[in-house]
Swiss-Prot record:
GO terms for molecular function: structural constituent of ribosome. The gene is rpsB. Belongs to the universal ribosomal protein uS2 family. One of its GO terms (biological process) is translation. Residues 308-320 have a biased composition (Low complexity). Keywords: Ribonucleoprotein, Ribosomal protein. It comes from the Bacteria. CDD domains: RPS2. It comes from Clavibacter sepedonicus (Clavibacter michiganensis subsp. sepedonicus). The keyword Transferase does not apply. GO terms for cellular component: cytosolic small ribosomal subunit. This is Small ribosomal subunit protein uS2.
């Protein structure tokens, strides 16, 4: 079942692209037609790619991963914060700080500082701080809250990243590519589809379009959270994150080779054992005589004993 219909995409204006003068030739395969100098995006392809991205996000979250929502343009700030908070995922809807992913250790120290300042009562002057010092700390906290408030609970780099407007968020995409973090993003007709692993062709400028696509990704994360909590955790181990494509292929090849080896051995063993049984049946000689009864055996023993008694005993040394 599709997570969204073409009618919903049309109503939100997802199909509207940029004017012909602002386009990337790499997006040609996603363009349906051109009307009044504006490119129209092929929503059939968008629908299929939405389903693919939805499944990826759901599986990522179900296996314990996190999705970082990124959208700093005005049209996306509200929906990014709202949907990310709804499903408990980190988000960045203000300015992207350089090194937020590639220099996460330093960012994590600032997050700890933010948590320390959250515990400070700025109206209490009886703790040894002057009013000026409390005012400076309050301003520091407000600044950190604005820039890092959305990722305060992020303890490691995210498993994947949802991006609105890949051209504007090029710094975030560059850092994600350096760390091998998959990117799901809205691709307008002026974007480069090679920059993201899970592209969704659509309008990244209209508020309704951005809100709809962001809500779909959040719904996928919510479904993944439900699956994560429903999974029995008998061993008490932390859920594993999804494997990379090359790791998955390597694992499948190893499983296939391991499964094929016992089957071949079993076939050979069965064939050899069948031959041995047939050969043993042919080589077993027929019995020469029937086994003697107990009475016949006793009579034979008595006869041998009588013959031994009747034989003369030898006395003295035997002459040479």
């Amino acid at each position: 079942m599709a997570v969204v219909t073409i009618r919903q995409l049309l109503d939100c204006g997802v199909h509207f692209g940029h004017p012909k003068t602002r386009w990337n030739p790499k997006m040609k395969r996603f363009i349906f037609t051109e009307r009044s100098g504006i490119y129209i995006i092929d929503l059939q392809q968008s629908l299929a790619l939405i389903d693919k991205a939805y499944d990826f996000v759901k599986e990522t979250v179900a296996h314990g991963g996190t999705i970082l929502f990124v959208g700093t343009k005005k049209q996306a700030q509200e929906s990014i914060a709202e949907q990310a908070q709804r499903v408990g995922q980190p988000y960045v809807n203000q300015r992207w700080l350089g090194g937020l992913l590639t220099n996460f250790q330093t960012v994590h120290k600032r997050l700890n500082r933010l948590k320390e300042l959250d515990l400070v009562d700025f109206d209490d002057t009886t703790r040894g701080f002057t009013k000026k010092e409390l005012l400076i700390q309050r301003r520091e906290r407000d600044k950190l809250e604005k820039s890092l408030g959305g990722i305060r609970n992020l303890t490691k780099t995210p498993s994947a990243m949802w991006v609105v407007d890949t051209k504007k968020e090029h710094l975030a995409i560059d850092e994600a590519r350096k760390l091998g973090i998959p990117v799901i993003g809205i691709l307008d007709t002026n974007c480069d589809p090679d920059e993201v692993q899970y592209p969704i062709p659509g309008n990244d400028d209209a508020i309704r379009s951005v809100a709809l696509l962001t809500r779909i990704i959040a719904d996928a994360a919510a479904e993944g959270l439900i699956q994560r909590h429903q999974k029995p955790d008998a061993e008490g181990s932390a859920p594993a994150e999804p494997l990379a494509d090359w790791e998955r292929e390597l694992l499948e090849q190893g499983d296939a080779a391991k499964a094929a080896l016992p089957v071949e051995e079993n076939d050979v063993d069965a064939e050899v054992s069948a031959k041995n049984e047939a050969k043993s049946d042919d080589e077993v000689p027929a019995p020469v005589h029937a086994p003697e009864s107990d009475d016949a055996t006793e009579a034979k023993i008595e006869a041998e004993a009588t013959e031994a008694e009747a034989a003369p005993a030898t006395t003295g040394p035997v002459s040479e």
